[in-house]
């Protein structure tokens, strides 16, 4: 029999929140559904695994995620209400809005590739969230379908929310096209299937790396496949750096896509950042004719 989770049924922050159940878990921490009686609402609380509390690299990553997300106000970014350390045991936490629905990966796995007229409006909204983040000097660095959550809001059936800024890099200045955010040279962070060529090579990153990752997401959402055929994470990393993408219509010959959409994706997936759309707003504008 599994031991009971010590957080379930617990009141935290002076009784402000009552933790009801665990709704997700990952390498960094667990996410719980909790009630906030004073506000008459449900919230999601992400708590860093206690066993990781002594890992300075991971605690700093968790704090970085909280700081990055707390700066963002765009409706398509998950909203953070408060973050800090629990008084009782020092556990790091983030209190966020509670979302109902499924992530983009689950949607594609359940329903298959998403039609262009449905997929493009989703990605356009994500571009809006990224544009705000980039203007504040925040690069996500781990965009993937699992980090785009589809909820219902304001009568919109597919209302995406960008999640998990755990790998975000925050600078003190506003991001301009081509400006640099320093990472540890030679270190590779992110998810191999969705990382940009410069990220795969451990180079310095800016907003254009996120644009590449978002274009990979769009490609997979439309086709159910990635832009390259590969058998391992290392092979994906290599192909992002060296191999041209397979055009949409070649990847799924049974479906037809506008030639112009292939051209938009080819530009967004250029190996060289300077040849891509330079901002999320530019990518947004290029996608609009197809949505």
Language-model features: where?
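Activation segment signature within eukaryotic-like protein kinase domains
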Residues: 122-123
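Activation segment of protein kinases
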Residues: 56, 151-197
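Conserved short submotifs of the Hanks-type protein kinase catalytic core
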Residues: 88-103, 107
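AlphaC helix of the eukaryotic protein kinase fold
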Residues: 49-71
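Protein kinase glycine-rich loop
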Residues: 20-26, 31
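A short, aromatic-enriched beta-strand patch in the conserved N-lobe beta-sheet
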Residues: 82-85
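Protein kinase catalytic-loop region centered on the HRD/HxD motif
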Residues: 127-138
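C-terminal lobe helix-coil module of Hanks-type protein kinase domains
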Residues: 130-131, 191-291
């Amino acid at each position: 029999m599994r031991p009971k989770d010590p957080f379930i049924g617990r009141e935290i922050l002076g009784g402000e929140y009552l933790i009801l159940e665990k709704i997700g878990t990952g390498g960094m921490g667990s996410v719980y559904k909790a009630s906030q009686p004073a506000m008459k609402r449900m919230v999601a609380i992400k708590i860093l695994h206690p066993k990781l509390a002594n890992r300075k690299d991971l605690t700093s990553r968790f704090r970085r995620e909280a700081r990055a997300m707390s700066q963002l106000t765009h409706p398509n970014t998950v909203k953070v209400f408060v973050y800090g350390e629990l008084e009782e045991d020092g556990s790091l936490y983030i209190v966020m809005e509670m979302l109902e629905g499924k992530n983009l990966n689950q949607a594609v796995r359940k329903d298959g590739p998403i039609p262009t007229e449905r997929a493009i409006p989703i990605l356009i909204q994500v571009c809006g969230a990224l544009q705000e983040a980039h203007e504040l000097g925040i690069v996500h660095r781990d965009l993937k379908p699992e980090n785009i959550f589809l909820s219902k809001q304001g009568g919109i059936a597919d209302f995406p929310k960008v999640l998990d800024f755990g790998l975000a890099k925050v600078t003190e200045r506003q991001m301009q096209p081509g400006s640099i955010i320093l990472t540890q040279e030679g270190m590779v962070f992110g998810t191999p299937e969705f990382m940009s060529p410069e990220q795969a090579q451990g180079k310095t990153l800016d907003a254009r790396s996120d644009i590449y990752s978002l274009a990979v997401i769009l490609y997979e959402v439309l086709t159910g496949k990635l832009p390259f055929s590969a058998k391992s994470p290392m092979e994906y990393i290599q192909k992002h750096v060296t191999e041209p993408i397979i055009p949409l219509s070649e990847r799924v010959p049974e479906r037809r896509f506008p030639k112009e959409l292939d051209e938009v994706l080819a530009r967004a997936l250029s190996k060289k950042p300077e040849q891509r759309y330079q901002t999320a707003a530019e990518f947004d504008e290029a996608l609009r004719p197809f949505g």
